[in-house]
Amino acid sequence: MVDRAKRSPVPPLLYRVEEAAEALRLSRTAVYELIRSGRLRTVKAVSRRLVPVAALAEYVASLERAA
């Protein structure tokens, strides 16, 4: 039997829009605007719009380059 308490949690590869907003410290509306403008990449999986972890990193990198 595997002791689940000893296993490390698996980090998510995809975030719901609300989770992405929390990670970026932005409002949900602001994240949807970034998605609409093409500045934040998403994927569609099982009728859900999800934000890949890599897309969050790409967006933050673009902010750093623009600074």
Please provide the spans of the model-predicted regions.
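A generic structural-conservation signal
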Residues: A30, V43-K44
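Proline- and acidic/polar-enriched loop/turn elements at helix boundaries
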Residues: E33, V46-S47
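C-terminal secondary-structure termini that scaffold catalytic or DNA-interacting sites
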Residues: A66-A67
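Polyanion-binding surface elements
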Residues: V2-E33, S37, A57-L63
